[in-house]
Amino acid sequence: MGLEWSSPGERQPLLFPGGPRSPRVFGRRWLVLLLFSVLAFLQGLVWNSWGPIQISARTAYKFSGLDIALLVLWGPIGFLPCFLFMWLMDNRGLRITVLLTALLMVLGAGLRCVPVEDLAIRRILIHGGQLLNGFAGPTVMNAAPFLSTTWFAPDERATATAIASMLNYLGGACAFLVGPLVVPAPNSTSGLLLYSGSTDAIKDRIEAVMYAEFGIIFVVFAAILAYFPARPPVPPSVAAASRRLSYRTSIFRLLSNLRFLLIVLAYAIPLGFYSGWIGVLDLILTPVHVTQVDAGWVGFWSIVGGCVVGIAVGRFADSIRGVLKPILLLLFSGATLSATWFTLTFLSNVTHLPLTTATLYTSCILIGVFLNGTVPIFFELFVETVYPIPEGIACGVVTFLSNIFMGVLLVFLTMYQMELSWLNWCLTGSCFLSLFFIACFRESYDRLYLDVFVSV
């Protein structure tokens, strides 16, 4: 009876006839992880280039508030061809997909550097460059679990996923640091060196940053072109050697899996809102008289803290397997409390909570620590829940939905720019909702079962 409801692909045995060769790991896996992580770092750095220096960018290039919002919005818009990249990864492998991604980033970074005197044309080129960089987002966000399964042993997978996925966030964090320190604010000396805040001086510094980013991205592209294997000679685990469902079957299975959809919403809503929120943190903190540099430091440490916690939690998950849901419950409890604290701080006249630099720093950094720390754990849980659906397809659906929520938030931002406290309430409410979804979720570890018991 069950055969009537399954596709031919689903009726194939997971393991190839005769069994897979004995699993083995190769030292080159760390080089592959390094190249991919650096690429992900640079994509995040370029995506978040403009938010932290939005005041200087308005002066140098006559950007409007709508322009600044659009420069951030190109990130989620770049996820529209997400399903194409998922298909490419599933059918052509990691090398072709990563090469195409790196090429898009080179073209995007180069487009921003075209020396045109007309500011209107220059703004169009910058927008185009940001869009091309956005098209690289699906790969750098989705491929981490695929890479870790392809190259790493079961007791290293969560750690590799954490490193590969967190470096993209770290790149976005470094944009909060690099931009405000290198690019001076108008009529100030807040840059890396004492420097006149004139329009020409600001423009020169912004262009220096863009040229440097282009050069580094080109070097990474050349390194990937020279050496980035699609897979190791021998799979590192039983799961890596097993058959996977086809692209079409995987999509249907994902959309009909209620447990998967529940945990997807638990990830997509708060992480999507947080990505949009942190991208315009400078605008949110402006009404409470936080400078561009201070806002940059807040954003930087909030994401860096999340990256450190994410990698540490990933290592812990590798050491003690089967505890992904409790980890998520703990992290989201902290995120919910921190977001509530940050939001109520802006209502100090009502709540009487102190509105100081220390409270803003602490609450904002804790939000980033707890939310960003959940990303690699979510990715591992997605793959475990829907195995044997390919990792790239499962995570592609997830990040696509996350960017839809991020895009919706930024679209509303383009219409309601005067008063931004509603962004804080959206973030807090999404954390509460996600905590409820995680509590209702029933976890399973199908891929882990295959590796532990079948290999034995």
UniProtKB/Swiss-Prot annotation:
GO cellular component, as recorded: intracellular membrane-bounded organelle; lysosomal membrane; membrane
Chain segments annotated as transmembrane: 30-50, 68-88, 96-116, 124-144, 163-183, 208-228, 260-280, 293-313, 327-347, 363-383, 393-413, 421-441
Localization per record: Lysosome membrane
GO BP term, pick one: pyridoxine transport
UniProt topology in membrane: Multi-pass membrane protein
Glycosylation sites noted in the Swiss-Prot or TrEMBL record: N187, N349
Keywords: Glycoprotein, Lysosome, Membrane, Transmembrane, Transmembrane helix, Transport
Cytoplasmic side: 1-29, 89-95, 145-162, 229-259, 314-326, 384-392, 442-456
CDD domains for this protein: MFS_DIRC2
GO molecular function: transmembrane transporter activity
A Pfam short name: MFS_1
Reaction(s) this enzyme catalyzes, per UniProt: pyridoxine(out) + n H(+)(out) = pyridoxine(in) + n H(+)(in)
Lumenal side: 51-67, 117-123, 184-207, 281-292, 348-362, 414-420
InterPro entries (alphabetical): FLVCR1-2_SLC49-like (IPR049680), MFS (IPR011701), MFS_trans_sf (IPR036259), SLC49A4-like (IPR049604)
Protein name from the UniProt record: Solute carrier family 49 member 4 homolog
Protein's gene: slc49a4
